[in-house]
Amino acid sequence: MNYTLLYIRDISEAASTIPCRETLRGKKIFITGANGLICSAVVDMLMTINDEDHAGISIFIATRNMSKTIQRFGKRCEREDITLVNYDATQPFHADIKPDYIIHGASAADPKAIMEHPTATIKSNIQGLSILLDIATKQNSRLLYISSSEIYGIKEGGEPLSENDYGYIDILNPRSCYPSAKRTAETMCVSYTKEYATDTVIVRPGHIYGPTMTDSDSRASSQFPRDLIAGKDIVMKSEGLQQRSYCYVADCASAILSVLIKGERGEAYNISNKNSIVSIRQMAESFAQAAHKQVVFSTASKSEKVSFNMMSNSSLTSSKIESLGWRALTDMPTGAEHTLNILRNSQ
């Protein structure tokens, strides 16, 4: 990734909202999923905190694809505060690391990959977390699990969902492999907390977007900006009336670190920007307007339809995480503009 001045500024400004970030000083933080949309930004934010505060945070990037990690972070992999660790979520893990914090973000989240590999989606979520929970228990580490707003399922009404609002999931639909695995993983976390006093905390991100998405990410909020950068209009395969909680990736990273520091043991926290609860269509229009392009409509194929998120409303409340002192900075129009500007200057 090309670290543009705008991206660096976005990360720095979002990091300024983290309450009590001095708590991270001198800590060892082990992060999975750092090649992906969310946790790559978390790594960038931790490096920024080190640069700004001389915080001495040791960042361990767990990866099963070293070349992809090096491609993502470039020469930053050579920094003294960065250590790359071979890691596969489905295999036993042994490393001479005693982390203070574990951030577990490794998970299939791409809708196309989920539908093509539902079994692997379940296994990687459950097996990977089980291994890390054992490490957290043994090493007395705090483990933050990155779950998903999809755990809420389908629920009547259009009000934003709070952390206790649970709806219906069709467990015989293979597309449910992802939310079902995430639900099970959350229960594993609180079960370890109950039985072994393991220090766990959970975040449930809404729909996260930004310039750190991977090339293979087929989610609409990643595909749309890629198409615009290629000079294409946005093609929507539905009316786009579903309500979503969108959150710019820099705000999501600061939310994760805020919960890591101040979240209550055994609790779950939504990650949502209350100023970016919009429909998929409105999200598409924000990106199109920023690029001076159009939103056009087409009919989805059968294979495309089966990968769709079935929730008509996955908007989330943010009051619980805001009670920790966190706040989002970037609304949807600004986030769309920044995403496109950063991607253009990264080519």
Q: What residues fall within each predicted segment?
A:
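N-terminal Rossmann/SDR dinucleotide-binding element
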Residues: 1-101
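Glycine/proline-rich active-site loop of Rossmann-fold NAD(P)-dependent oxidoreductases
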Residues: 183, 199, 210-223, 232, ...
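Conserved C-terminal active-site "lid" loop/helix of NAD(P)H-dependent oxidoreductases
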Residues: 249, 279-282, 304-328
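Mid/C-terminal beta-alpha module of Rossmann-like enzyme folds, strongest
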Residues: 262-305
